[in-house]
Amino acid sequence: KRTLCVVVDTYQVGLVESKEILEKCGKVAVIDHHRKGVGYIQNPDLVCHEPYSSSASELVTELLQYVGDRDDKPNRVEAEGLLSGILLDTQDFTLHTGVRTFEAAAALRRYGAETERVRQLFDVTMVEYAAKAELVERARMYRNCAISVGGEIAPEARVAIAQAANDLLRIQGVDASFVAVQVGTDR
């Protein structure tokens, strides 16, 4: 019961990796930027909840600047992981950014994060790119929604689903996007 479980980037019990581990821990801390919704974690011992923050990575970076020793900071790999979270949630600093977002990114650069290496984390294979392109091409407009209903895509290309949905949101006049596909052959 002395174990601390730190839940990051979600407030919902249904989205944690292991509900069993969460329930067995004596103490729970939540760090999240999403609005509190249904099924949230009840009675956490510590909450860092900022719905106006760009990402959970931004919040973690801010916390790291105020805790521990000056020598106890993230290494390059950890800093690059946090920077990748900021880049992902802000779509390369184009959405939901503020001064705090850029300050967090600057701190991560001071910790050794290299933007070129972080960008490489987002490189896709030809299979993933082709799957995304096909899903975007299949999209049809209904009111202000882009809807793409695909056939089946390979499990190794499942990242293309979210990428296609994000790309569709960048089209002028699109307020929402939906992408539905069968992943793999298991039914």
Predicted regions and their residues:
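Hydrophobic helix-and-loop "lid/oligomerization" segment in the mid-to-C-terminal part
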Residues: K1-L4, L88-R187
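N-terminal small/polar loop signature for handling phosphorylated ligands or for N-terminal nucleophile
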Residues: K1-K24
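Short glycine-rich anion-binding loops that position phosphate/pyrophosphate groups of nucleotides
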Residues: T10-V13, H34-K36, I153
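A generic local secondary-structure boundary/capping motif
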Residues: E17-E20, V47-E50, D72, V136-E137, ...
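Hydrophobic/aromatic beta-strand patches that form the interior of the parallel beta-sheet core
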Residues: V6, K27-I31, L46-H49, A146, ...
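Solvent-exposed alpha-helices and their adjacent loops that cap or buttress functional pockets
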Residues: E20-E23, Y40-I41, P74-A79, R138-M141, ...
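Short alpha-helices
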Residues: H33-A106
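Short, well-ordered alpha-helix to beta-strand connector turns
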Residues: R2-T3, C25-K27, Q42-D45, V174
